[in-house]
């Protein structure tokens, strides 16, 4: 009797080469195990004392960061269940800017504790129902835990309350300098609210960052306008600062238009050759004179600048700057109010822009061109000039600034100004409240709700671990501070008890009001929503079916024997 080999299920349904993983093979447990690997990797990067990771992507670029969204974006992840969490962190990054590590760690912890529930016999449906009930309860409780609100969004000191904790979680120790830079740059571009309660419009693209090697972070500064990491093309390098200067922006080349087809010109003598070149010179001279007669003192070109055109522009005393990036060209038009012109010729008065200062500066060893507006006016773009010793450090600082700017964007939302206690104080309080809610819930769903509360313990525990504190000592002290009310204390004083990452107190607990450590309500709500949805999505998957990858046969990787051009 011949041996009968088992076949893949649905072998006649899909093409050859597909893979299928179902619950019969322990698919959920395997997905949780795969996510746990990523969860452990991001765990040590959370908080102000979080460790950095060195990532070498598929292009060989070295990235040093502790931001979960950046790490996951650069890694080539193929597991479909893990990709669900990657998309969740990306969504948090796009919408709120901050809280990406919280999304990844909380979602991973929710799946870790769900594994215990599955081993106890609970079905995935019951766990999902319990998690959704706990999520709705948590969002309601967060509204009751608000301890402050930023009312004046144009006040620089109020902005610092919200920007500083965001940046300190990425670049601890440099948060004072960076938060001052971000708040100053935001104050330059943020319009003043005309009415009480009006929310000003803020565009994150209005804050630009220019990185210049050399010096230290304390040498960084903010320019009310734009900075280009190149100098002008001609002899004119700067314009006087006693008046406003007219600016013309061209997206076409500053040169004679050439035909697409080649032509031949027959010249009989030297005079014909001189007359031929004179025609070009007169045409270019006439164009540049028309531009100069309009009072233009600065030209920004998005394409090439011909030598002949540059010669006449130097003669008329016009500064010429080449900006190859169409995005930078668009931002410069916003700064000076100019209209980009696709044709070479004299612009109309409505198409010209105005700028107060155009000058070339030497910062470090680089020459940069600065377009600066008046101090009393609201600029549409502000630029932060960063100084540092290494390119990797500058890139990481830029990502921290981007998070701070994105947090300002979240602040401009209707409920963005409300603040929650930071340093793990909110999570400790949520554990107590969600656990009590689970005890009031009948049936098996209370097990899932209680485990949902247990998952929040990962935040204060990780903050204490990365700070080098004894977790077994800090967590009990933190629970006691939230459950025991001191004599004469205000009823809500326990909400402000968080993890002391500096180790100034023996108990590892401090009042977060001393350091103004707050979290944004909108960011926390969005992170809990996204993390819970990602975890329940993974739990709801009962089978993974992966088709065969597209593509033909791969070329041999090793060297061919013999000479390189030898025939087969």
UniProtKB/Swiss-Prot annotation:
Q: Which GO terms describe its biological process?
A: chaperone mediated protein folding independent of cofactor; protein folding
Does this UniProt record's set of keywords contain Transcription regulation?
no
The record's GO molecular-function terms, alphabetically, read:
ATP binding; ATP hydrolysis activity; ATP-dependent protein folding chaperone; unfolded protein binding
Q: Which Pfam families match?
A: Cpn60_TCP1 (PF00118)
Gene3D superfamilies the record matches: GroEL, GroEL-like equatorial domain, TCP-1-like chaperonin intermediate domain
Question: Which PROSITE patterns does the UniProt entry name for this protein?
Answer: TCP1_1, TCP1_2, TCP1_3
Q: Where is this cross-link: Glycyl lysine isopeptide (Lys-Gly) (interchain with G-Cter in ubiquitin)?
A: 15
Report the principal subcellular site. Answer: cytoplasm
Give the modified residues of type Phosphoserine. 505
Output the CDD domains linked to this UniProt entry.
Answer: TCP1_theta
Q: Which UniProt keywords apply?
A: ATP-binding, Chaperone, Cytoplasm, Isopeptide bond, Nucleotide-binding, Phosphoprotein, Ubl conjugation
User: What's an example GO cellular component term for this entry?
Assistant: chaperonin-containing T-complex
The record, for InterPro entries, names:
Chap_CCT_theta, Chaperone_TCP-1, Chaperonin_TCP-1_CS, Cpn60/GroEL/TCP-1, GroEL-like_apical_dom_sf, GROEL-like_equatorial_sf, TCP-1-like_intermed_sf
- Similarity annotation: Belongs to the TCP-1 chaperonin family.
What this protein is reported to do is described as: Molecular chaperone; assists the folding of proteins upon ATP hydrolysis. Known to play a role, in vitro, in the folding of actin and tubulin. In yeast may play a role in mitotic spindle formation.
Name of the featured protein:
T-complex protein 1 subunit theta
């Amino acid at each position: 009797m011949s041996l009968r080999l088992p076949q893949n299920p649905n072998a006649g349904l899909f093409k050859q080469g597909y893979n299928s993983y179902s619950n019969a093979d322990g698919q959920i447990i395997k997905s949780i195990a795969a996510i746990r690997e990523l969860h452990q990797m991001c765990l040590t990067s959370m908080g102000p004392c979080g460790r950095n990771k060195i990532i070498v992507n598929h292009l060989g670029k070295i990235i040093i960061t502790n931001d979960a969204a950046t790490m996951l974006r650069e890694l080539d992840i193929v597991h479909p269940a893990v990709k669900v969490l990657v998309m969740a962190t990306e969504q948090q990054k796009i919408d709120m800017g901050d809280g990406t590590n919280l999304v990844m760690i909380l979602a991973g912890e929710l799946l870790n504790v769900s594994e215990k529930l599955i081993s106890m016999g609970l079905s995935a449906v019951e766990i999902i129902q319990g998690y959704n009930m706990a999520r709705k309860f948590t969002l309601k409780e967060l509204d009751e835990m608000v301890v402050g609100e930023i009312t004046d969004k144009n006040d620089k000191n109020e902005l610092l309350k919200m920007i500083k904790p965001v940046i300190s979680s990425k670049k601890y120790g440099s948060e004072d300098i960076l938060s001052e830079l971000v708040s100053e740059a935001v104050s330059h571009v943020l319009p003043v609210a005309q009415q009480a309660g009006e929310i000003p419009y803020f565009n994150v693209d209005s804050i630009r960052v220019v990185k210049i090697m050399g010096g230290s972070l304390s040498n960084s500064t903010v320019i009310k306008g734009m900075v280009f990491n190149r100098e002008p093309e001609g002899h004119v390098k700067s314009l006087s600062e006693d008046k406003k200067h007219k600016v013309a922006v061209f997206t076409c080349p500053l040169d004679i238009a050439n035909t697409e087809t080649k032509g031949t010109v027959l010249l009989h003598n030297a005079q014909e050759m001189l007359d031929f070149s004179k025609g070009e010179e007169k045409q270019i001279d006439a164009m540049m004179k028309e531009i100069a007669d309009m009072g233009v003192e600065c030209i920004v070109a998005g394409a090439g600048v011909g030598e002949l055109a540059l010669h006449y522009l130097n003669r008329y005393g016009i500064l010429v700057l080449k900006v190859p990036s169409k995005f930078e060209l668009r931002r410069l038009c916003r700064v000076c109010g100019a209209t980009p012109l696709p044709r070479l010729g004299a612009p109309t008065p409505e198409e010209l822009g105005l700028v107060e200062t155009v000058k070339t500066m030497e910062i470090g060893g680089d020459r940069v061109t600065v377009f600066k507006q008046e101090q009393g006016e609201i600029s549409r773009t502000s630029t932060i000039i960063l100084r540092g010793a290494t390119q990797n450090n500058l890139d990481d600082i830029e990502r921290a600034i981007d998070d701070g700017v994105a947090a300002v964007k979240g602040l401009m939302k209707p409920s963005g100004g409300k603040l929650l206690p930071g340093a793990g104080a909110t999570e400790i309080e949520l554990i107590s409240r969600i656990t009590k809610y689970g005890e009031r819930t009948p049936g098996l769903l209370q097990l899932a709700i209680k485990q949902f509360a247990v998952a929040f313990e990962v935040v204060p525990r990780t903050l204490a671990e990365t700070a080098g504190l004894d977790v077994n000592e800090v967590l009990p002290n933190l629970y006691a501070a939230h459950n025991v009310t001191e004599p004469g204390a205000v009823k809500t004083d326990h909400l402000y008890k968080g993890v002391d990452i500096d180790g100034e107190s023996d108990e590892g607990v401090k009042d977060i009001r001393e350091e103004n450590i707050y979290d944004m309500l909108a960011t926390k709500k969005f992170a809990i929503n996204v993390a819970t949805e990602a975890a329940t999505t993974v739990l709801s998957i009962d089978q993974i079916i992966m088709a065969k990858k597209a593509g033909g046969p791969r070329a041999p990787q090793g060297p061919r024997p013999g000479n390189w051009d030898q025939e087969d």
